[in-house]
Amino acid sequence: MEKWWFNSMLFNRKLEYRCELSKSMDSLGPIENTSLREDPKILTDIEKKIHRDLDYLEMEGFFSSDLNTVSKNDDDHYMYETQFSFNNNITSFIDSCIESFNLGDIDKYNDIYFYSYIFLKGRNCSESDNSSTSIITSTNDTNDSDSTIGESSNNLDESQKYKHLWLECENCYGLNYKKFFKSKMNICEYCGYHLKMGSSDRIELLIDSGTWNPMDEDMVSLDPIEFHSEEEPYKDRIDSYQRKTGLTEAVQTGTGQLNGIPVAIGIMDFQFMGGSMGSAVGEKITRLVEYATNQLLPLILVCASGGARMQEGSLSLIQMAKISSALYDYQKNKKLFYVSILTSPTTGGVTASFGMLGDIIIAEPNAYIAFAGKRVIEQTLNKAVPEGSQAAEYLFHKGLFDSIVPRNLLKGVLSELFQFHNFFSLTKNDKA
């Protein structure tokens, strides 16, 4: 009689617990990550698996209690210990089940699969370790450090594996697919930030197809002062950048047509030694200005530079005066039209010379424009530079240049400027 009463009570308690567990499982979705509700099939599979194992555990616990009742029915704490053990088994099973369906992995089946998987997981691996809703790590404390290190290493490997497919935005850290990035003019598709653009890409952006004629392509820098460096000789560094970029120097100069209008254009490339201005760069720009003067062409100079090239000493500094002198003859004596375009970054000797001498000065959005960089100013004056004080938008409101023009509108704006200054298209159908 006592055995029947005990088993009946135990069965009722377990049945009651089963009902409560089922109710809690029904509300698991909204309590945890809401992304689970996006795939009801996954949730249904989880519930089926849990209920199947619950049935097995209940039967096993029920029969084991029958076998042990004779020896333990006098123990007042037996019912409590049995249910406590049963609770532990259920809790452990639920934990392992949730771990197998990593909530961070479920989010990867969104439209931006690679964005969440490759970038967010790789870049924010330290943050995801602290987020229980993103990744549920092992409950075994002794293995926490090892699992974290292993996960971080795997995330880094994944980021490197797909690095050639994506370009990270400097502003919002969004990932832009490289295959389509060029067609978007190197503008972030998430926040509209203008990322750095190579000189060859800018030529394609501004100059009509098939009209580009480069000048002084064979002009290269030597080592005029035999600059000594413990890390890498100056000549070797030049050779390295030439192989890396496919350019001979940090500027490309030439002539072409912009919506049918003949122009002389020079475009600096920050990828080549930070766009630094050495003797070869200064000579190429000076020759371009002189050619535009003789041919009566409108002139465009696109600036992207860290300033004078220190490896050439005073020879790099004299380029500032040489280019400015050629521009004086072009603007003052010939009354021709020069447009300066400031991109990010434009600093140092370029800002102090031809960068600010344009008849019209245009800046790209968010461009970093300064004479001395933020770090140099803070180290020299021991004062903090206000945030954004060297950004194009702030400087525009202070009157430093004429307009901020987005990259996708730049060609049309230049075309209208040239037409306004009596430079007209050679073709019959002018492109808008």
From Swiss-Prot:
Function, in words: Component of the acetyl coenzyme A carboxylase (ACC) complex. Biotin carboxylase (BC) catalyzes the carboxylation of biotin on its carrier protein (BCCP) and then the CO(2) group is transferred by the transcarboxylase to acetyl-CoA to form malonyl-CoA.
Catalytic activity reported: N(6)-carboxybiotinyl-L-lysyl-[protein] + acetyl-CoA = N(6)-biotinyl-L-lysyl-[protein] + malonyl-CoA
Listed GO MF terms: acetyl-CoA carboxylase activity; ATP binding; carboxyl- or carbamoyltransferase activity; zinc ion binding
Location (main, coarse): plastid
Required cofactor names: Zn(2+)
The name this protein goes by in its record: Acetyl-coenzyme A carboxylase carboxyl transferase subunit beta, chloroplastic
Keyword Glycosyltransferase: no
Lineage, top ranks: Eukaryota, Viridiplantae, Streptophyta, Embryophyta, Tracheophyta
Family classification: Belongs to the AccD/PCCB family.
Keywords carried by this UniProt record: ATP-binding, Chloroplast, Fatty acid biosynthesis, Fatty acid metabolism, Lipid biosynthesis, Lipid metabolism, Metal-binding, Nucleotide-binding, Plastid, Transferase, Zinc, Zinc-finger
NCBIfam families recorded: accD
Region feature Disordered, mapped onto this chain: 127-154
One family name in Pfam for this protein: Carboxyl_trans
Protein's cellular compartments: Plastid, Chloroplast stroma
Cofactor details (free text): Binds 1 zinc ion per subunit.
